[in-house]
Regions:
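Conserved beta-strand elements of the Class I
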Residues: 15-17, 310-314, 494-496
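Long, contiguous domain-sized segments
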Residues: 28, 32-160, 371, 385-392, ...
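RNA-binding accessory domains that recognize and position tRNA/RNA substrates
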Residues: 1-14
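Conserved SAM/SAH-binding loop-helix junction
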Residues: 25
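Short, flexible hinge/linker loops that cap or flank conserved catalytic cores
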Residues: 10, 305, 488-489
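Class I SAM-dependent methyltransferase "Motif I" SAM/SAH-binding loop
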Residues: 20-21
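Extended, Lys/Arg-rich, non-catalytic nucleic-acid recognition/anchoring regions
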Residues: 5, 28, 32-305, 334-338
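Long, charge-dense tracts
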Residues: 225-229, 245-430
Length: 722
């Protein structure tokens, strides 16, 4: 097992660096720009620098500017040179290495960018044509005493980006915000372009294409579909290391050597662990055991069927095409046959008649395995006269509301609406896009859950493979469990999930909260609020603790799956106070869960043909940080979708000063997270995020689009978002 990082050693321990002072005389915007692209050294904390450079003895603070082009046109009042021993301070040494790496690539005309966690993102030209340039991005990050003794360089292939060859000033229709530009060798948001950038470049900065401006510049966004993520990522990182990093020029200009050549770091055996085999087992409707819902759910049905039958009805547009798709979908779900019973209006001419004949032949040739009832192990009830049609997108909400207010619906019955829509979930038209959310909200206000099906998917020859996904989601929405975990972690744990979602065009992020009350993955309550609305979150947590105690007794542990790395001190105190008010004394653990991305440090298994580790593997990265792999590979070199691992940071949530966690506690928590990853019922395809985070994130994604920006009461006890 290796990680995408290579060991380096410094050739020059002592280096001469430029440091600056006197930025207080600059404008506020210049001060902010300078501070953002420098590290600050101060008296008291960083006395080693004052001891090495007597010239700065009268300064209280100095700055080392390691992103130099970003501060072009900004000149602090004072400039000093100091001899710096790289062994004296890791923080400054890392900045010096970063500066040297950025200089090396920019000297070779490669744009560089600091990403949101401080890594160097290098943009390498991949393709050029008359109108655009495509870049392949790579990230580089120096670390000290992480995966080896001493220094290492993490190297990863990132995403692609496309840049227009036409400068911004020549495209009058471009907005003032919402995209980044290449400015010299920098990547800068357009809204942060200042006069100093115009002066330095003569106004020649070029827009980076994103979905918001793609139509304006007439260039498609970059999209590279990868079917072999792990092997291709490792190969790309190796090629980049060989061609650009492990070279004489890099060694000389950055001042490093590679003691192990161009080899990535091998992980010691004690860092690589595996969850117990029994933790991988799932259970289905006939109590059959298995590990892969994609292969097994269709044959064995749900672990827990919905207790009460639901009545189904359709919502579609009022036109012939929609009626045609409605009848087709009804027959697919009810009889596993894709035909329409001649539901079209009469043909208008011979050409139309011939077209419909061919279309019927194509439809009838489609294979559908079995009706939805055989997946659900429960026959759906279709009640005549319940289906609703609407005239247009503009009148849809009013017409559906009027229909729901009719006497056809009864409060003692449970309903599920099947919405057939021609609006894709990524539709760029804002009004059409919002209709999707408003329909969901309206139905919940009347206590009705819903399943949305994109009309064009019904035409797909692979629609047969959509049906198990629809069935799994319906089971969850109707209160059942599509599958469960066979072997549960012992103990009476209360598990809380808090996820966040920040979306383009919505200023403040929203939190979604899910309170899981048993280890099978059953939820009792959802909610969503703005990220700064801590009162609502605290109130929900307190109610949930009391409900948990009433149903299951006092918890042995409170485990919070959280979108942040750790609780603030005041957040810990508030939770501890709540537990005391409920007369509960139990440990609190916080698990930060993040999906590893292309650019992260991840582990590769060289014994697997595609380099992806087996499901259940977890890697101890550092401190309390781990990588956890959940996929469908259960045998060496078995076929499976390539899913990136999740990064876990496990910390003590109490203010008791105890940070060391017991090995067995860590193992139980990681096993629990692994099992929650395997209970995702939105699809039969395995996911790599636990439902304690994935479901709250879905809730937080929907709520900002609702008319009242709050979750209807019905939606707090129902998996409506699947």
């Amino acid at each position: 097992m290796i990680v995408n990082s290579t060991k380096i050693e410094l050739t020059n321990e002592v280096r001469v660096i430029d440091i600056f002072a006197g930025i207080g005389g600059l404008s506020v915007s210049y001060q902010n720009a300078y501070k953002k692209n420098s590290i600050r050294m101060s008296v008291g904390r960083d006395d080693f620098l004052w001891n090495q450079c007597s010239e700065i003895e009268k300064e209280d603070e100095v700055f080392f500017n390691y992103w130099e082009e970003e501060t072009i046109g900004i000149t602090p009042e004072k400039n000093y040179q100091a001899e710096f021993d790289m062994s004296k301070n890791v923080r400054l040494a890392k900045a010096v290495l970063t500066q040297s790496i950025v200089r090396y690539f920019r000297k070779r005309n490669c744009p560089c960018h600091r990403d949101f966690i401080g890594r160097v993102e290098v943009w390498m030209k991949a393709q050029e044509d008359d109108v655009s340039t495509s870049y392949q991005k790579f990230t580089i990050q120096p670390r000290f005493n992480d995966q080896c003794d001493g220094w290492q360089l993490d190297i990863a292939e990132g995403r692609n980006s496309v840049v227009s060859m036409t400068p911004v000033k020549d495209i009058a229709e471009l907005p003032q915000d919402g995209y980044d530009v290449i400015c010299n060798h920098c990547v800068i948001p357009i809204k942060r372009i200042e006069q100093r950038h115009w002066t330095a470049t003569n106004g020649l900065f070029y827009p980076i294409v994103n979905p918001g401006i793609s139509g304006t510049v007439g260039i498609k966004c970059s999209h590279k579909r990868e079917t072999d993520k792990f092997a291709s990522k490792l190969a790309a990182a190796q090629t980049f290391l060989d061609s650009w990093i492990c070279t004489d020029d890099f060694k000389r200009e950055v001042g490093v050597i590679f003691p192990n050549g161009n080899q990535f770091i091998s992980l010691p055996a004690d860092k690589v662990m595996m969850v117990d085999e029994e933790a991988k087992e799932l259970v289905y409707g006939d109590r059959t055991d298995g590990k892969s819902p994609r292969l097994e759910f269709r044959n064995h049905g749900p672990y827990k069927r919905p207790e009460t039958p639901f009545t189904y009805f359709f919502i579609t547009k009022d036109d012939d095409t929609s009626k045609f798709y409605r009848m087709r979908l009804f027959n697919i779900l009810q009889y596993a046959k894709d035909y329409c019973y001649g539901n079209w209006s009469k043909p208008v001419d011979e050409k139309d008649k011939e077209f419909r004949k061919k279309e019927d032949a194509r439809i009838n040739a489609k294979t559908i395995d079995k009706p939805i009832a055989e997946y659900l192990l429960q026959r759906p009830i279709w009640e005549g006269g319940l289906s609703c049609t609407y005239t247009s997108d503009q009148t849809a909400i009013a017409e559906i509301r009027k229909h729901l207010q009719s006497s056809r619906f009864h409060t003692d019955q449970k309903y599920i609406a099947i919405i057939i829509t021609d609006i894709h979930r990524d539709d760029q038209n804002k009004e059409r896009h919002e209709l999707y959310y408003l329909m969901k909200e309206l139905l919940m206000q009347y206590g009705i859950t819903s399943q949305v099906i994109y009309r064009n998917n019904i035409d797909s020859t692979s629609f047969n493979w959509f049906i198990p996904n629809i069935a799994a989601a319906l089971v969850g929405k109707m209160g059942g469990m599509a599958w469960g975990v066979k072997s549960l972690v012992k103990g009476n744990d209360m598990i809380v999930g808090i996820g966040a979602c920040k979306q383009r065009g919505i200023k403040k992020p929203y939190l979604g909260s899910a309170f899981c009350f048993d280890k099978e993955g059953s939820f009792r309550n959802f909610n969503s609020c703005r990220a700064d609305d801590t009162e609502t979150l605290q109130s929900d947590l307190k109610k949930s603790i009391l409900n948990f105690c009433e149903d299951y007794g006092k918890p042995d542990r409170l485990i919070i799956h959280y979108y942040k790395k750790k609780l603030k001190r005041e957040e810990s105190e508030q939770i501890e106070n709540m537990l005391r008010q409920c007369d509960i004394d139990c440990p609190i653990y916080v698990v930060n869960v993040v999906t590893a991305s292309n650019e992260d440090l991840i582990a590769f298994d060289l014994y697997q043909f595609d380099k992806m580790p087996m499901s259940g593997t977890y890697i101890h990265l550092r401190g309390t940080e781990y990588l956890l792999y959940n996929n469908e590979r259960y045998t060496p070199n078995g076929k499976a979708d390539k899913l990136y691992p999740i990064k876990l940071t496990i910390s003590n949530g109490s203010n008791n000063g105890i940070n060391n966690l017991d090995y067995q506690v860590v193992r139980e928590i990681i096993t629990q997270v692994y099992q929650f990853c395997r209970l995702y019922w939105k699809s039969v395809k395995m996911q790599n995020v636990p439902i304690t985070i994935a479901y709250p994130e879905l809730v937080a994604k929907y709520v900002p689009h609702f008319s009242y920006e709050e979750l209807p009461e019905f939606g707090r006890k129902n998996l409506w978002m699947l």
